[in-house]
Amino acid sequence: MRTYFGAASVAAAMLIGAIGAGAQTAPQPAVVYDAGGKFDKSFNEAAYNGIERFRKETGGTYLEFEVNNDAQREQAFRRMAQRGASPIIGIGFAQAPAIRKVAAEFPKVNFTIIDSVIDLPNVQSVVFKEHEGSFLVGALAVMSSKTGKVGFVGGMDVPLIRRFQCGYEQGAKHVDAKAEVIANMTGTTPAAWNDPTRGAELAKGQFARGVDVVFAAAGGTGLGVYQAAKDGKRLAIGVDSNQNHLHPGTMLTSMLKRVDTAVYAAARTAREGKWVPGTTSLGLAEGGIDWALDEHNARIISAQMKERLETIKADIIAGRIKVHDYMSNSACRS
């Protein structure tokens, strides 16, 4: 059994339609990963899976670079542009300053950035409505909690991660107004994305306060959270990629952020001469955000929980449930 609500094929069709329409030639694409490496089992790895899907389906090739520090970002994009790559796909909001500068220097090269918006004629921006998916998993967390206390571990303390936290809190309160959400951020530097030891420490601290379900939006740091949940016989929620398989039976679900499909769509539409600049925002309705149900968590998701969560999802898509976006006013209304 392997079921993803918002199946990959459907999401791909919707995202390709949203991201590409127009006509132009397309040289070899390139991907510049964010800190944490392409095999972080989360955000970067989703991007890697997307470009690998492009390679396998089209027979095309691509260039790639893994950023280890901020000083490498601008150099990486400039090098890719000099090599004639296009589109050059930057993974993560931290790539924005480098792309903004290099894209201005190479106006005939196309760039795609994931998780940020750059207003330049040769840049395509793809952002996600993370608050919608976080609302869903927050609701599921409280449905599954026996204590009424659920946790959140964020990576780097930035507005994007506050958006995750805020959506999660709203979903939890939607199910139970008395639910308590205990939240921690890992740090204030990019190192916060790749510190599983600290992630485990934060999770254990929350468990000691009564938390029995924890959601990590923290890149590689989340791996420590998930291990701590397994060791402590609690439940954890993955992020970005489907991480249910990491610890079957204690991974309640994963909030899917279809970075893989966005990267695939950018490369594929460029190859087909349909890449266009501009901003695309992807949420539940567009198939860019969802939750994961598969053979690894099916036993801990009851039919009633699934039905209720799908109803909440439909209500968000229809506008019957309004999910406040932290980034609209830098505040959370849960």
Report the location of each language-model feature:
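Positively charged n-region of N-terminal signal peptides that target proteins for export
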Residues: 1-4
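A residue-level marker of the well-folded mature domains of exported/periplasmic proteins
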Residues: 23-334
